[in-house]
């Protein structure tokens, strides 16, 4: 639309996690950068909540097969549909009420985090993760739902369980180990880890597609920061 204000956008994803496996990581990264440049006007509208927007996923056979490799593909797709219905609260019998209750609980958690006025978050895990993330000055916690400039409330991600806050770009230190594969440019980065010092990545690695991770972290001057 010439004037997108007042419009809504819905993105439905059905991705193959390894659709581009084996292709040159550098070329894929350049394609991704070009795509982001082309979509920048749309992203400015959505990321600034000027319009209502939502991202949701539906099963693709290749994705379902990755999640449930022990099942025949058709059964895997059906099972993944059921998982999506469950986590999206479709299976509750009254999804609208279920979402209203979930949003209320998430907002309560968000408000508690803001009341604590945290300086930083320290994340530790049995897999070796030990990461301290300093929060940006005057940062606030957000989550659950958003509002457009016109005051219309909407949920941007279905499902969503997160509350989030902006980190300080120079106050991130430690190492994070991924517990799940990371899908980037149609390829899987598996067994990955990233180490930060003063907000900048100083060491990284992966058991699979380490070169793709390196390309991702060298996309531009700020891509090696959290």
PLM feature spans:
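Tryptophan-anchored aromatic micro-motifs
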Residues: 176-177
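Active-site and channel-lining beta-strand-loop segments
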Residues: 190-205
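Solvent-exposed, flexible loop/coil residues
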Residues: 135, 167-168, 188, 193, ...
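Beta-strand elements of well-folded, non-transmembrane domains
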Residues: 180-182, 198
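Dual-mode signal for accessory low-complexity, basic/Gly-rich regions
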Residues: 203-226
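Active-site bordering "gate/hinge" segments
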Residues: 1-173
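Short loop/turn motifs at secondary-structure junctions and domain boundaries
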Residues: 183-187
């Amino acid at each position: 639309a010439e004037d997108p204000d007042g419009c809504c956008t819905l993105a439905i994803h059905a991705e193959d996690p390894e659709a581009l496996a084996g292709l040159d990581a550098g070329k894929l990264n350049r394609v991704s950068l070009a795509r982001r440049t082309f979509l920048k006007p749309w992203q400015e509208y959505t990321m600034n909540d000027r319009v209502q927007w939502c991202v949701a996923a539906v099963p693709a056979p290749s994705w379902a097969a990755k999640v449930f490799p022990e099942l025949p593909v058709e059964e895997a797709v059906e099972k993944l549909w059921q998982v999506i219905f469950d986590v999206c609260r479709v299976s509750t019998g009254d999804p609208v009420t279920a979402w209203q209750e979930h949003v209320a609980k998430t907002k309560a958690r968000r408000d508690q985090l803001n009341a604590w006025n945290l300086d930083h978050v320290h994340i530790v895990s049995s897999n070796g993760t030990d990461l301290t993330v300093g929060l940006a000055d005057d940062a606030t916690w957000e989550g659950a739902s958003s509002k457009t400039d016109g005051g219309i409330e909407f949920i941007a991600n279905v499902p969503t369980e997160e509350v989030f806050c902006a980190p300080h770009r120079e106050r991130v230190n430690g190492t994070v180990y991924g517990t799940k594969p990371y899908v980037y440019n149609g390829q899987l980065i598996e067994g990955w880890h990233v180490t930060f010092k003063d907000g900048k990545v100083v060491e990284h690695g992966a058991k699979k597609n380490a070169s793709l991770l390196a390309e991702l972290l060298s996309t531009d001057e700020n891509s090696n920061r959290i």
